[in-house]
């Protein structure tokens, strides 16, 4: 955990000071922005870690080094919030942890709330990044592998938001317990902003027209 904590703190400082890098080294804006998003994705991936202390450290970095930073420009915070808000909200609810994690979550959300209030006070508009095209996979990638992740990434690069559903049980597969498989997928896609786990409380049978109709309406 100590090594992970140091690595996460380093990533947080890198994100805080990243705007100086773009001034010093001339490169296309797309390349610079992609690197920034990779750094943010690495921090978010730690929110899906199976170790609670790692998740707590990730929350601390997100709160203090990103949304609570006095160095990071408000427009950069807004850009990152727009991209990661949905993923962050999902990860906070997926791995709630114990009582101590509750205080970490509260502190992080407090930093985010202050950022939003301050940004809007001075005329900024905080939005979440959305896409019109949706791709849904009903248990196709179960068990989930790195090859499946690459397929999901390629689809989201085409402008889709990808949702992955985890089958409850299948007689045709020697599957691991449902929550274990869900955790594996969650850890694998935590750094992908437009790839999400489908909610567990909404079962979908693609052979059922009523389920397909409900899926389109969501």
Residue locations for each model-derived region?
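Long alpha-helical repeat scaffolds
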Residues: 14-19
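Nucleotidyltransferase catalytic core that binds NTPs
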Residues: 8, 12, 24-218
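Polyanionic/metal-chelating signatures
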Residues: 5
């Amino acid at each position: 955990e100590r090594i992970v904590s140091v690595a996460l703190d380093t990533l947080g400082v890198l994100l805080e000071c990243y705007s100086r890098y773009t001034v010093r080294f001339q490169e296309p804006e797309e390349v610079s922005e992609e690197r920034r998003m990779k750094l943010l994705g690495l921090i978010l991936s730690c929110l899906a870690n199976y170790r609670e202390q790692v998740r707590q450290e990730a929350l601390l970095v997100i709160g203090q080094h990103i949304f609570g930073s006095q160095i990071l420009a408000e427009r950069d915070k807004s850009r990152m919030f727009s991209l990661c808000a949905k993923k962050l909200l999902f990860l906070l609810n997926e791995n709630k942890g114990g009582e101590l994690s509750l205080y970490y979550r509260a502190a992080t959300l407090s930093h985010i709330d202050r950022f939003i209030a301050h940004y809007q006070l001075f005329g900024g508009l905080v939005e979440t990044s959305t896409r019109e095209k949706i791709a849904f996979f009903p248990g196709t990638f179960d068990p989930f592998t790195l090859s499946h992740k690459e397929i999901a990434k390629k689809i989201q690069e085409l402008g889709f938001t990808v949702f992955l559903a985890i089958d409850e049980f299948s007689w045709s597969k020697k599957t691991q317990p449902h929550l274990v498989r869900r955790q594996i997928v969650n850890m694998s896609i935590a750094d992908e902003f437009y790839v999400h786990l489908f909610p567990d409380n909404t079962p979908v049978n693609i052979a059922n027209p009523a389920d397909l109709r409900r899926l389109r309406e969501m």
